[in-house]
């Protein structure tokens, strides 16, 4: 709805469709094939969440809550975000990218122009009682 006024606007996020990771490239291609459009940030988070759960279910019995929690904490899956881990309070540790709105053919999308924060965890993790 914003149209051309959005071009050049910069924003930050932990994901972008142009991240050069095998899992992300495959995810974006499959999503475009299935839905005819570029996936959103929220779609990538949902995909990562499903793969996190599947990775934990592959190594731990879901009825054993402690074992399953440990398997989730290991986060042993190929994320669309690249390297992925959880901090001590279960927030992700991840890069935060600077993106810019551009035209790609006839669609508006974001492209990475830099990294704002590397391996960033929750700023308040030290205050968490977990």
Language model feature labels by segment:
Residues 1-130:
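Extracytosolic ligand-binding ectodomains
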